[in-house]
């Protein structure tokens, strides 16, 4: 980022990169396959099969419910990437749709604060296509790891992270997309303090109002309208999440660590107070009735509760953590808030030129159709692997 988006001088993080796993990279067996066009690595008993341009060494850097992530070197572009293996990607239709959605969204976007897809590995045999491998640009760590570490964070660090989240969100929202699952672990960082938003598997089009049954966003960062099952949610849901994330950065602990839906709502009302009748206007009658029967809570003073936080930061967070989404600050207005004056530069906060289309989701796709769509995305990166 040029001009207003330059990082503060002291923002390089000394130990941003987490310690690599203990398994020695030289111990990972590698075998060429399919006539030397592919290479198989055996990682913790997992077969990791990618195109032969991903030469050794390869290193496991993460593991999740979906599979395993390795850092690898693309010998053709001379770039280090993070390759995520999604094992048996088509076994569950909802998961397969998430994968397809993430691929299509990230290929549509091009922004410094949104993680980029560098490659989708084509299957060695089109007719046996079960695992999906996606290569992303490689980052050192994520905000969740930084918050939990003893890495010192200055006010300037936190301010710069907040600015970059909002800068990325401005672009995402301008593409007609809501992220819907912003949380510290979905914000990637490098040692230079560059921040990139990732994990668009739950993203939705902003004009869509049907409530999604597959909605599993992390409870702690969830806006009140989602906790109260409002189907008519807007870009304001992401702004609420940003407010929660920023306060977690400043306080080094989650702002609203609810155990369940009911506890989550209680925690946020204990801080921001019971909403007025006027602020309930966006809710359905059931939700209004539920709120009215709760014990009343008086709003706490943010400044007294968080005396170590800059007053201008408190003012911005209070505008983000506003119960009524119609009154919540927008991303554009948050970027222009006095707290971010030193970083804000409207000429360097681009928008997406073409809105993203979720048209592919309008049809009930079969497993085979989803395979074909992801296969085509892989061929866009690797046309020479057309079968």
Curated annotation (Swiss-Prot):
Q: Which Pfam families match?
A: Pkinase
What the record says about activity regulation is: Activated by tyrosine and threonine phosphorylation.
Annotated S-S bridges: none
> Does the keyword Transferase belong to this entry?
yes
- InterPro entries hit by this protein: Kinase-like_dom_sf, MAP_kinase, MAP_kinase_CS, Prot_kinase_dom, Protein_kinase_ATP_BS, Ser/Thr_kinase_AS
How is it modified post-translationally?
Dually phosphorylated on Thr-213 and Tyr-215, which activates the enzyme. Autophosphorylated.
Binding-site residues for ATP, renumbered to this chain: 61-69, 84
Q: Which UniProt keywords apply?
A: ATP-binding, Cell cycle, Cell division, Conjugation, Kinase, Mitosis, Nucleotide-binding, Phosphoprotein, Serine/threonine-protein kinase, Transferase
Report the EC number(s), separated by commas if there are several: 2.7.11.24
Active-site residue list: 181 (proton acceptor)
Tell me its cofactors: Mg(2+)
Q: What class of enzyme is it?
A: transferase
Q: Which residues carry this modification: Phosphotyrosine?
A: 215
Role played? May play a role in the mitogenic induction of symbiotic root nodules on Alfalfa by Rhizobium signal molecules.
In the record, the note on similarity to other proteins reads: Belongs to the protein kinase superfamily. CMGC Ser/Thr protein kinase family. MAP kinase subfamily.
Name of protein? Mitogen-activated protein kinase homolog MMK1
Organism the protein comes from: Medicago sativa (Alfalfa)
Q: What gene name does this entry carry?
A: MMK1
């Amino acid at each position: 980022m040029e001009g207003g988006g330059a990082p503060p001088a002291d923002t390089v993080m000394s130990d941003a990169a987490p310690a690599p796993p203990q398994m020695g990279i030289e111990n990972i067996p590698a075998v060429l396959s399919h006539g030397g066009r592919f290479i198989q690595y055996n990682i913790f008993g997992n077969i990791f099969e990618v195109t032969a341009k991903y030469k050794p060494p390869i290193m496991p850097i993460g593991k999740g419910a979906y599979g395993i992530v390795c850092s690898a070197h693309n010998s053709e572009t001379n770039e280090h990437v993070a390759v995520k293996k999604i094992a048996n990607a088509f076994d569950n239709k909802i998961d397969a749709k998430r994968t397809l959605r993430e691929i299509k969204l990230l290929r549509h976007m091009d922004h410094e604060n949104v993680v980029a897809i560098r490659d989708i590995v084509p299957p060695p045999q089109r007719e046996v296509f079960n695992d999906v491998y996606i290569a992303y640009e490689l980052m050192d760590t994520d905000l969740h790891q930084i918050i939990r570490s003893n890495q010192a964070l200055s006010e300037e660090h936190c301010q710069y992270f907040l600015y970059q989240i909002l800068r990325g969100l401005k672009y995402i929202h301008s593409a007609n997309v809501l992220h819907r699952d912003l949380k510290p672990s979905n914000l990637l960082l490098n040692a230079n303090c560059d921040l990139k938003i990732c994990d668009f598997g739950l993203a939705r089009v902003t004009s869509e109002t049907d409530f999604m049954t597959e909605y599993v966003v992390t409870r702690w960062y969830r806006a009140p309208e989602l906790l109260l099952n409002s189907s008519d949610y807007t870009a304001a849901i992401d702004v609420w999440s940003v407010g929660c994330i920023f306060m977690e950065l400043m306080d080094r602990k989650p702002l609203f660590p609810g155990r369940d839906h009911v506890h989550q709502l209680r925690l946020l009302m204990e801080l921001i107070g019971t909403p007025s009748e006027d602020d309930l206007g966006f809710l359905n009658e059931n939700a209004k009735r539920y709120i009215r029967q709760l014990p009343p809570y008086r709003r706490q003073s943010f400044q007294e509760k968080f005396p170590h936080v800059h007053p201008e930061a408190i003012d911005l967070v209070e505008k983000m953590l506003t119960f009524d989404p119609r009154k919540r600050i927008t991303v554009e207005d948050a970027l222009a808030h006095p707290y971010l004056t030193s970083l804000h530069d409207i000429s360097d906060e681009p928008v997406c030129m073409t809105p993203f289309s979720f048209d592919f989701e309008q049809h009930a796709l079969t497993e085979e159709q989803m395979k074909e769509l992801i296969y085509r995305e892989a061929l866009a990166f690797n046309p020479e692997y057309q079968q």
